[in-house]
Each structure stands twice: as structure tokens, then as C-alpha cells.
């Protein structure tokens, strides 16, 4: 995209956060309701609040941490759920906290620090909650000039060209110092040579790293009716950006990338701005009678695209995708029948009501770019619900066979009623090698970590944390990826617990 086109794109996206988001929440005491529910359901502590802005501790080690495993697991997630007498009305509105689990021959050390966003600073100075969130706005909420005013930097991590970025899907990345986790500030990708900046343009929380080391991402600007596409070079410079008009607009959270295409599923959760809506989420309408649109974009020409259709569905996360020489794309996703887990579950849980929405099952998709057809099929037996899929990073955007994900078996649910198993699933054989966590532990996202010198998808580890609500501790767990069912080969136990987070990245070295 030429510099003039960058300017046009920025002008199109320079629109304020929808005014309807200023409709304020009622006077119900969500903090009190949550505290009361916590007495009956102690596992709700996983959605509690942080008691400080900075945590740091050496971990108590059990088992054997491999000498060749050296690096840092960076994670982020919503952690600041209550401040100044106001409790957020949606899990995704919590102020972000970035974690670093530093793993080396002499042990594991953990550090976590609240991201010092513009929102955090403004509310600290005012001594009260200021900005609207997904589901509601606090009393006396103020208007904003754009999404970055309320950006909590709480969803995912990107480590690219030496920079550590905390991501949120509706605004700019926040740069974090990888050594002490202090906040550098909002980060803006720019053209090579310091050209046009894309500051403030939505940068989704799920970028994809291509085979050449470059990064692809998208963002959605609801008020402008646009999807924005990004291509970031391996050197961190902005190589290209494009846009696609979408009407009606929706809320895509993730996407997949192949050798030649970008693919997004656009659920029929249509943007319908209303002046009296309590929060941005409530400016959307679920239309199950409408199809889920599938947008396919040419990587070499971001203006070239076409749409296909699937039955109505909701997808938070994809595992991976690849494309064969005949132009057939195969990908996988945790597919839910509707967005109730976001619109209901993640709201109700914040006031202590464990009312779980309709969970996702794992599906495989086959998209023929030449015939322009798409089909879908369940990959697991009914009753196995999944989320947080990930893959060996060495096969990102390429042919793959194995997926790591969390799951719950409807026939063997945990006391807390949510995900309680970590899996390594073999697409070709259909084998699911899994470990069931004790009911007192709620697992967070687990990642595949390659063993140095190994072939892709062989000989690696699975690394992930869990919230132990019975002991008030965070536990980092390491599994042998070849024998997941045997349980962790090593653990690192912290003397504190931090509310459940979302996504992370392991950085070797």
C-alpha cells in the first residue's frame, strides 16, 4: 500500500468509540454478589481480583525440568477486575497483567506486572473507574476519543523482532520491556524508513507468524464497517496493509493463514449500534437464521477476496491452516453454536453466577479456493468440548498433524464446570492423548514447546499453568508431548494465585 493509501485508511478509521457505549450500568452491587457467591463456590477465586500491581517469586520445583529447556513463557490476561468500588461486568474488561515464567537450569522464576495503559493511568489519576467496557459502563463514565482510551492490553502476546507486545483486539499493541515487564507504551508499526504510522488502527490479539518470519494480522473497525489487514516484515516494519468493507460488521476474534490466503469466519453477530446499549457487546445482535460468512483474501493482493457461507456458528480460536497445491485449505477450530459463552457466561461469572453457555466442539474445515466450496466436520466424539487450540510453532501456516487444546468431557465434568483436560490430538490417527487435572485446579492455555534439535511435532513438551483455588497458588506444569496422559514431568509452584489469564508465547533462550 502506498503512503497516500495509508493516509486514506487512517482517515477512515479515525472515528470515535460508538457513543452508545456510554450507557451506564445499573446500581447492582456486583462486588457484593461476587463475594457472596465465592463463599458457596470457592473456585470463583479464579475470576477474583489482584491484590497488587507487581508479583515476583522463585517457584518451588517438583519433578525434573529438562536442562535443554531454557526460555521464558510470557502470558497476559485480564487481572484487574475491581477498582475504585466498581467491578467489571465482563471478564474481558479486566486490566491486563503480563507474566514471565523464566525457565533455566537453576529453576523457575515468575514475575507479573500490571500493564500501565492510558486507561490505568487516567483512572488512577481520577480515583475512579472512567471508561465503558464490553458489557457496561461505570457510573459517570466519560467519552473516549477512540478504542485506545480503554485498551486494557489483556488478551495475547506477540514477541517479534526483539519486541514484546501485549495485545487487545480493538486497539494498538502495548510494548512491554521483556526484562522487567515495565510498560514502554503504545506501539505503532510503521513503513520502512519511518513512513506512515498505523497508531490507533485495531490490531487483533491473534497474529499469525508465516514461514518467512513475517507476521499477518487483522483488525476490525465497527463504526467504519471495515476489516483491516496487516503484513509485518520479519524486521518489524509494516510491509503492507489493506481493508475490506463488511456489511453487516461483526466481531471476528481470530483467523488463519496459508501459503496463499487469509481466512476469516464472520459469525452472524451483527453490529447494530444503539444509543442506549450498555457496552459495546450489546450493540450486536445474534441472528442464527443468517449464515456465517467465510472471507477468503489473497495474500498477494489484499483487495482480492471472495465470500463463502457456513451455517451460523461462533469461533473464538483456530488451531492452524494449510493449503495444498490444488488450492484446498484445511483448518481447525473450536466451534460453538452461538456466542452465549461471551454474551452470557463471561458476564454472569463476574457477579458470581456460574451460568455456562453452550460450549465449543472441535471441527475440521475443508475450503476449496478453486471450486469455491467449504465443508465442516466434527473431529471429536460428542460431549468433548474444547478451547485454546495451539500447535508446534514450527508448522504455523503450514501442513500440520497435531493440535494442543484444553477440553472438558461432558461425562466427567470438574466441580468448577469448565475446562479440566490438556490434550495432544493427532489429526491423522484421531488419537487424543490427554491428562485430566484435579478438580481443585483450573488449567489455562497450554502451548507446544519444541525440543531443541527435534523434528517438527516430535519430541517436544507441553507447557501451561493452572489456578489452584484450594491452595491459592499458581502452578506451572510441563508434560512430555509423547506421553501427556502420564501427567506432568515437572511442576513449578508459586506462593500466590493470579486470576485466570488468556494467551501467551514461549520464547526460547
Tell me the role of every PLM-derived stretch:
Residues 5-25:
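N-terminal export signals
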Residues 83-86, 267-286, 336-356, 408-416, ...:
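Short, conserved, GDST-rich strand-edge loop motifs in beta-rich repeat architectures
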Residues 228-234, 279-300, 347-369, 420-426, ...:
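Beta-propeller blade signature
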Amino acid at each position: 500500500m502506498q503512503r497516500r493509501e495509508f493516509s486514506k485508511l487512517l482517515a477512515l478509521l479515525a472515528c470515535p468509540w460508538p457513543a452508545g457505549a456510554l450507557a451506564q450500568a445499573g446500581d447492582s452491587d456486583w462486588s457484593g454478589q461476587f463475594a457472596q457467591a465465592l463463599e458457596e463456590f470457592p473456585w470463583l477465586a479464579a475470576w477474583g481480583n489482584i491484590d497488587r500491581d507487581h508479583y515476583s517469586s522463585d517457584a518451588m520445583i517438583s519433578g525434573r525440568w529438562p536442562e535443554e529447556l531454557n526460555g521464558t513463557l510470557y502470558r497476559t490476561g485480564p487481572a484487574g477486575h475491581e477498582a475504585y468500588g466498581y467491578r467489571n461486568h465482563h471478564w474481558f474488561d479486566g486490566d491486563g497483567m503480563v507474566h514471565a515464567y523464566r525457565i533455566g537450569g537453576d529453576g523457575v522464576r515468575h514475575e507479573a506486572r500490571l500493564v500501565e495503559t492510558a486507561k490505568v493511568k487516567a483512572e488512577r489519576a481520577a480515583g475512579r473507574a472512567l471508561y465503558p467496557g464490553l458489557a457496561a459502563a461505570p457510573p459517570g463514565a466519560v467519552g473516549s476519543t477512540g478504542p485506545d482510551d480503554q485498551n486494557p492490553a489483556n488478551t495475547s502476546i506477540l514477541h517479534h523482532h526483539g519486541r514484546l507486545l501485549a495485545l487487545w483486539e480493538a486497539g494498538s499493541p502495548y510494548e512491554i520491556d521483556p526484562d522487567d515487564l515495565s510498560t514502554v507504551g503504545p506501539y505503532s508499526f510503521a513503513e520502512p524508513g519511518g513512513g506512515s504510522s498505523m497508531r490507533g488502527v485495531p490490531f487483533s490479539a491473534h497474529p499469525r507468524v508465516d514461514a518467512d518470519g513475517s507476521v499477518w494480522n487483522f483488525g476490525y473497525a465497527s463504526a467504519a464497517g471495515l476489516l483491516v489487514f496487516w503484513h509485518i516484515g520479519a524486521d518489524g516494519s509494516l510491509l503492507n496493509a489493506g481493508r475490506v468493507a463488511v456489511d453487516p460488521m461483526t466481531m471476528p476474534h481470530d483467523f488463519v493463514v496459508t501459503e496463499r490466503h487469509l481466512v476469516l469466519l464472520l459469525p452472524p453477530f451483527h453490529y447494530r449500534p444503539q444509543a442506549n446499549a450498555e457496552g459495546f457487546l450489546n450493540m450486536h445482535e445474534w441472528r442464527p437464521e443468517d449464515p456465517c460468512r467465510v472471507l477468503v483474501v489473497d495474500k498477494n493482493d489484499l483487495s482480492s477476496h471472495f465470500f463463502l457461507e457456513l451455517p451460523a456458528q461462533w469461533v473464538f480460536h483456530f488451531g492452524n491452516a494449510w493449503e495444498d497445491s490444488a488450492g484446498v485449505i484445511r483448518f481447525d477450530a473450536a466451534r460453538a453454536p452461538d456466542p452465549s459463552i461471551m454474551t452470557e457466561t463471561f458476564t454472569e461469572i463476574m457477579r458470581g453466577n456460574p451460568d455456562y453457555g453452550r460450549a465449543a466442539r472441535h471441527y475440521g474445515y475443508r475450503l476449496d479456493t478453486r471450486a469455491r466450496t467449504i465443508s465442516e466436520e466434527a473431529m471429536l466424539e460428542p460431549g468433548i468440548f474444547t478451547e485454546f487450540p495451539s500447535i508446534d510453532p514450527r508448522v504455523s501456516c503450514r501442513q500440520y498433524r497435531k493440535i494442543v487444546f484444553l477440553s472438558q468431557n461432558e461425562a466427567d465434568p470438574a466441580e468448577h464446570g469448565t475446562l479440566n483436560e490438556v490434550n495432544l490430538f493427532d489429526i491423522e490417527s484421531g488419537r487424543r492423548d490427554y491428562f485430566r487435572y484435579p478438580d481443585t485446579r483450573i488449567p489455562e492455555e497450554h502451548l507446544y514447546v519444541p525440543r531443541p534439535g527435534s523434528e517438527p511435532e516430535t519430541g517436544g513438551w507441553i507447557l501451561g499453568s493452572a489456578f489452584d483455588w484450594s491452595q491459592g497458588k499458581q502452578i506451572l506444569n510441563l508434560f512430555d508431548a509423547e506421553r501427556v496422559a502420564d501427567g506432568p514431568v515437572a511442576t513449578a509452584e508459586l506462593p500466590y494465585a493470579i486470576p485466570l489469564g488468556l494467551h501467551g508465547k514461549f520464547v526460547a533462550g
